[in-house]
Structures are given as structure tokens and as C-alpha cells.
């Protein structure tokens, strides 16, 4: 039973619970009208302390399509946070108004702190450079729907692997499925954090390699996960300018990829995937965004005990 659980990290749920969510998401995709009122009378609070378009709108659309309602803020300056209110007090107050919280925060561990003061489920919609579990559910559902299997894949992850919370969450989740291999493509400065390398990959004897060449990595992968170099994570903007265009996936590079390779991206993109790739049948990132809405519908319905 997922009712009243928090989702702060992919490891909070078992593989069986993932499958439960994916099964419901698939059913909703196939017959959305059947689920359009199951959360009637329920309220989602979206507390976004960091800018977001896709994740916030995906959560809001998901709740509205389930028949529920949405309250919240999209930047801290429009809330009592700007007056100095603590996270603890914000969460305890929102508990009086809502049935469920989706929260994004720039500080790692903020969602965990929020859950300590909440009697209603808290969903981590991204905490700094740490984790982004609903993006992971989105990624897994997309792979499952279009590849058919979450096991036995060679996944190349490219770009900002140091600060990229979507990358950290995805590695953590896919490492729980059998025979997956990882190719980690990044500049030396943006390599995967040690805790991911040591506590997840090496501890579980998962095959991986770290390289700097996208052209080399793309040859072996059947899933390519592109990420942007994140301007907001850099203190030194000259360093960002130096690294921002180091990886650009274009039509020429796609010619070196497998015919059945899947290209994913958590979005937003900047320059790392050229628009010409959008027309390639291997580009799945907009289908991925749609899967995100359905998987959030399934997740919220489960946490609220409505499905």
C-alpha cells in the first residue's frame, strides 16, 4: 500500500511499488476518462522554491485531470517565505489546507526536512543537485512503454553528471534492475559524485565506464540520456561559458548511433540537442514529458489511496 507514503528518493519505493505505479499509469494512458474524477475534493499544494515549468505544470495538469484542485506558489518571493517564514512553519500551515505536497527546493535534503513536519504525503520535485524521483518514474515509464524492458540496457548519460539530480536518481533506480550497464559521459569537472560511484555502482558491482567523448559513448548505447549544463549550479560563470556547449547531439552524431537507440532528456534543453534531432524517430523526449504527467497522476492517486 502506497497510501500516505512520502516519495523523497527513488529508494523509498520497492521495485514492486514502482510496477504498481507503472501499471496504473498505463491504464490511465489507455482510458483517461475512467480516472477523471477519482481525486475529486482533493487538493495538491505545489511549493516551488526554485523556477520550474515542466515539473510544476505536469503536477498541476495531473491533479486537475484526476478531478482535484491545486494551490501553491511558483517562486518564494510570492509567498511568506520572503517574509522569513521557516520551512517547518510553511509545511505545517500547508498541512491545514491540502491533502498532498509537491515541493522543489534549492537545498539538498529539504524534502526530507519537510516530510518530518508533514502529516500528509510529501513528493520531492527536486532538491538541489540531489534527487528528482518523479522524473525518475517518468524516465522508467518511458523506457518501459517504448523499450519494453527495464533490464539489460546500456544507458549512456551525458552532460552535467555532477549537479544533475535527474541523473543521480536514474542511476539509483536503474541499478536495481538486472544487467544494466552505464556509460558516463562528461567533462572531468562535471563527473558523477563519489557517493553515486562508490555507494551505488561499485557497491553493487554494476558495470560502468567514465569517458569524455559523446561520439564514443553513443556507439554502444541503446538509451542515451542527454542533460543540459546547468548555469544556475555554477558559481564561476566563466566556467559555465567554457563548458556549456561541450556536448551537442546533432544529426551527424546520430548516424553513429544504433538504429533502435532511444534519446531521452529531462528538459528543458538549451543547446545540447539540435532541433534537427526532433525529427529522428529515436527522439523520445517529448513522449517522455507526456509520460511524466501520467506517472504523476498514478503516483498521486496511489498516495491519496484513490486507486
Swiss-Prot record:
L-aspartate binds at residues 83, 165, 228. It comes from the Bacteria. It is an enzyme of class 2 (transferase). Belongs to the aspartate/ornithine carbamoyltransferase superfamily. ATCase family. It catalyses: carbamoyl phosphate + L-aspartate = N-carbamoyl-L-aspartate + phosphate + H(+). This is Aspartate carbamoyltransferase catalytic subunit. Gene3D superfamilies: Aspartate/ornithine carbamoyltransferase. GO terms for biological process: 'de novo' pyrimidine nucleobase biosynthetic process; 'de novo' UMP biosynthetic process; amino acid metabolic process. Transmembrane segments: none annotated. It comes from Clostridium perfringens (strain 13 / Type A). Keywords: Pyrimidine biosynthesis, Transferase. Its EC number is 2.1.3.2. InterPro entries: Asp/Orn_carbamoyltranf_P-bd (IPR006132), Asp/Orn_carbamoylTrfase (IPR006130), Asp/Orn_carbamoylTrfase_sf (IPR036901), Asp_carbamoyltransf (IPR002082), Asp_carbamoyltransf_Asp/Orn-bd (IPR006131). HAMAP family: Asp_carb_tr. Carbamoyl phosphate binds at residues 54-55, 104, 132, 135, 267-268. Heterododecamer (2C3:3R2) of six catalytic PyrB chains organized as two trimers (C3), and six regulatory PyrI chains organized as three dimers (R2). The gene is pyrB. Catalyzes the condensation of carbamoyl phosphate and aspartate to form carbamoyl aspartate and inorganic phosphate, the committed step in the de novo pyrimidine nucleotide biosynthesis pathway. It holds the Pfam family OTCace_N.
Amino acid at each position: 500500500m502506497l497510501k500516505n507514503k512520502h516519495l523523497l528518493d527513488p529508494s523509498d519505493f520497492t521495485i514492486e511499488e514502482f510496477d504498481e505505479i507503472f501499471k496504473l499509469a498505463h491504464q490511465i494512458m489507455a482510458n483517461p476518462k475512467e480516472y477523471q474524477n477519482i481525486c475529486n475534493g482533493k487538493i495538491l499544494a505545489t511549493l516551488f522554491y526554485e523556477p520550474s515549468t515542466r515539473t510544476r505544470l505536469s503536477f498541476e495538469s495531473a491533479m486537475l485531470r484526476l478531478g482535484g484542485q491545486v494551490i501553491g506558489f511558483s517562486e518564494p518571493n510570492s509567498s511568506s517565505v520572503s517574509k522569513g517564514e521557516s520551512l517547518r512553519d510553511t509545511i505545517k500551515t500547508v498541512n491545514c489546507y491540502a491533502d498532498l505536497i509537491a515541493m522543489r527546493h534549492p537545498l539538498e535534503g529539504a524534502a526530507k526536512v519537510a516530510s518530518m513536519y508533514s502529516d500528509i504525503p510529501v513528493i520531492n520535485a527536486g532538491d538541489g543537485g540531489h534527487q528528482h524521483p518523479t522524473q525518475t518514474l517518468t524516465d522508467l515509464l518511458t523506457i518501459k512503454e517504448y523499450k519494453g524492458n527495464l533490464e539489460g540496457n546500456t544507458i549512456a548519460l551525458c552532460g552535467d553528471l555532477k549537479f544533475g539530480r535527474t541523473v543521480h536518481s536514474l542511476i539509483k533506480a536503474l541499478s536495481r534492475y538486472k544487467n544494466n550497464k552505464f556509460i558516463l559521459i562528461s567533462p572531468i569537472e562535471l563527473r558523477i559524485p563519489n557517493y553515486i560511484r562508490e555507494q551505488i555502482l561499485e557497491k553493487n558491482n554494476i558495470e560502468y565506464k567514465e569517458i569524455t567523448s559523446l561520439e564514443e559513448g553513443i556507439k554502444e548505447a541503446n538509451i542515451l540520456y542527454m542533460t543540459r549544463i546547468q548555469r544556475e549550479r555554477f558559481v564561476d560563470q566563466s566556467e559555465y561559458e567554457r563548458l556549456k556547449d561541450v556536448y551537442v547531439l546533432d544529426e551527424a552524431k546520430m548516424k553513429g548511433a544504433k538504429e533502435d537507440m532511444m534519446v531521452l532528456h529531462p528538459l528543458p534543453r538549451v543547446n545540447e540537442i539540435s532541433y534537427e534531432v526532433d525529427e529522428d524517430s529515436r527522439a523520445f523526449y517529448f513522449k517522455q514529458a507526456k509520460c511524466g504527467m501520467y506517472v504523476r497522476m498514478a503516483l498521486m492517486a496511489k498516495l491519496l489511496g484513490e486507486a
